């Protein structure tokens, strides 16, 4: 699945790929949930 990004800094939820970046590997956000995100510019957070 792909996420829709309006800007390069928008985030994609787990198990999606960034439409303006490359296929993402995922890392925990550290926000106290099981969700992980990658940024559409290809940077990981």
Swiss-Prot record:
Source organism, top-level taxon: Bacteria
GO biological process: defense response to bacterium; killing of cells of another organism
Alphabetical keyword list: Antibiotic, Antimicrobial, Bacteriocin
Function: Bacteriocin.
Protein name: Bacteriocin fulvocin-C
């Amino acid at each position: 699945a792909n996420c829709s990004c309006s800007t390069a800094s928008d985030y994609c939820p787990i198990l999606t790929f960034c439409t303006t970046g490359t296929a993402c590997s995922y890392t925990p956000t550290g926000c106290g949930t099981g969700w992980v995100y990658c940024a559409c510019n290809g940077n990981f957070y």
